[in-house]
Curated annotation (Swiss-Prot):
Gene transcribed to yield this protein: TRIM17
InterPro entries to which the protein is assigned, alphabetical: B30.2/SPRY, B30.2/SPRY_sf, Butyrophylin_SPRY, ConA-like_dom_sf, PRY, SPRY_dom, TRIM/RBCC, TRIM17_PRY/SPRY
ZnF RING-type: positions: 16-66
Protein name: E3 ubiquitin-protein ligase TRIM17
Organism of this sequence: Homo sapiens (Human)
Organism lineage: Eukaryota, Metazoa, Chordata, Craniata, Vertebrata
Zinc finger intervals, B box-type: 94-135
Length: 477
């Protein structure tokens, strides 16, 4: 107890009575009291502003004893500076160990206010009715609680670390999978590019072989005809020479030249030259790429030919001829041909749609695009000059008619499933056989004067059906 009391007394001696904190740059007045230099100067600054006269100019009252002390006579107390430093460093003399109000040790703990108090505070009106514990007992309880909280936090830190490690592992695995997929994409495209190059070379080689075979036959025909021409020219010269001879000379031995003339006959080529190469332009995977621009094309019932019936079945939209007809002819309706257009007009971008044909007999059909203001009342040729970019075919034939090629496109088989691709900005309309992926025809470098609509045409009533859909599905039986 004597050590505690001694420590308390030492703490009191090292404490400034103005700020109630350990001395900072302590100074001593002429009356022998000590204060922090900043505290005494602030106190005197306040006193200077108060009314009344001081007994001596430049003197101020001591905050402890009120004795007047000249300001210039403040003396530094270096010994007290050392004492204050020792008190601050001593673990038993920390400022928080004493009550700031009563300067008594904080030996108790108020549970309601959750703060340490001294014995004087315990008897005060503020804490008299509160539950108070000895500080050591409260410390033990809080130590247990802090240990529980720290253990919980340690568990959470461990859990967080495990989660972080798991997420880092997931991140690394994800990046590894993405890297593997990226490498796979690059590899597959390299393989596809190599395959496309090889396929291109194969098609070009086949086309070159076909060109050489046909050209060889044609060259042989040219050479044969050239030989026949020379023989005919030689015979003509002989006959012209004989015709200029005298009568007796002309009549001599006429049997031989006349017999040669009678034996002359021009031999025509045995095989007619093909109108188009047999080698088909077929790019693997092109249809799948074009389907990235797939449109859900819906035929417009308000403008369709009166004898066309539009109906849906299982998400498919069918365009088929109907002999009954609607009997209603608006100004926008096709009346010259069994035609219809799509509801949506395209004025930019790339668009692709597919049409299946279930055509009967030798009916004529046509597919493509047309201007949104084409003539619908008159029978006009379906050519670009009239606003049509279409291909057409009579079922049973193998020649697809176009209006930009001098000769029709020869087909191995009439297509039953067509794909139409419009690139508005490029001025191109391309046609494909979806069944085998072959390219059939392209209108290129076209100048479209306005919006374009998908165009469908059946040659006559009872000619069959067109299946217009974005997805073709069937169940294998």
């Amino acid at each position: 107890m004597e050590a505690v009391e001694l420590a308390r007394k030492l703490q009191e001696e090292a404490t400034c009575s103005i700020c109630l904190d350990y001395f900072t740059d302590p100074v001593m007045t002429t009356c022998g009291h000590n204060f922090c230099r900043a505290c005494i100067q602030l106190s005197w600054e306040k006193a200077r502003g108060k009314k009344g006269r001081r007994k001596r100019k430049g003197s101020f009252p001591c905050p402890e004893c009120r004795e007047m002390s000249p300001q210039r006579n403040l003396l530094p107390n270096r010994l007290l500076t050392k004492v204050a430093e020792m008190a601050q460093q001593h673990p038993g003399l920390q400022k928080q160990d004493l009550c700031q109000e009563h300067h008594e040790p904080l030996k108790l703990f108020c549970q309601k206010d959750q703060s340490p108090i001294c014995v004087v505070c315990r008897e005060s009106r503020e804490h008299r009715l509160h539950r108070v514990l000895p500080a050591e007992e409260a410390v033990q309880g809080y130590k247990l609680k802090l240990e529980e909280d720290m253990e919980y936090l340690r568990e959470q830190i461990t859990r967080t670390g495990n989660l972080q490690a798991r997420e880092e592992q997931s991140l690394a695995e994800w990046q590894g999978k993405v890297k593997e997929r990226r490498e796979r994409i690059v590899l597959e495209f390299e393989k596809m590019n190599l395959y496309l190059v090889e396929e291109e070379q194969r098609l070009l080689q086949a086309l070159e072989t076909e060109e050489e075979e046909t050209a060889s036959r044609l060259r042989e025909s040219v050479a044969c005809l050239d030989r026949q021409g020379h023989s005919l020219e030689l015979l003509l010269l002989q006959l012209e020479e004989r015709s200029t001879q005298g009568p007796l000379q002309m009549l001599q031995d006429m049997k031989e030249p006349l017999s040669r003339k009678n034996n002359v006959s021009v031999q025509c080529p045995e095989v007619a030259p093909p109108t188009r190469p047999r080698t088909v332009c077929r790019v693997p995977g092109q249809i799948e790429v074009l389907r990235g621009f797939l449109e859900d094309v819906v035929p417009d019932a308000t403008s369709a030919y009166p004898y066309l019936l539009l109906y849906e079945s299982r998400q498919r939209r069918y365009l088929g001829s109907s002999p009954e007809g609607s009997g209603f002819c608006s100004k926008d309706r096709f009346v010259a041909y069994p035609c219809a257009v799509g509801q949506t007009a395209f004025s930019s971008g790339r668009h692709y749609w597919e049409v299946g044909m279930n055509i009967t007999g030798d009916a004529l059909w046509a597919l493509g695009v047309c201007r949104d203001n084409v003539s619908r009342k008159d029978r006009v040729p379906k050519c670009p000059e009239n606003g049509f970019w279409v291909v057409q075919l009579s079922k049973g034939t193998k020649y697809l008619s176009t209006f930009s090629a001098l000769t029709p496109v020869m087909l191995m088989e009439p297509p039953s499933h067509m794909g139409i691709f419009l690139d508005f900005e490029a001025g191109e309309v391309s046609f494909y056989s979806v069944s085998d992926g072959s390219h059939l025809h392209t209108y290129s470098q076209a100048t479209f004067p306005g919006p374009l609509q998908p165009f469908f045409c059946l040659g006559a009533p009872k000619s069959g059906q067109m299946v217009i859909s974005t997805v073709t599905m069937w169940v294998k039986g």
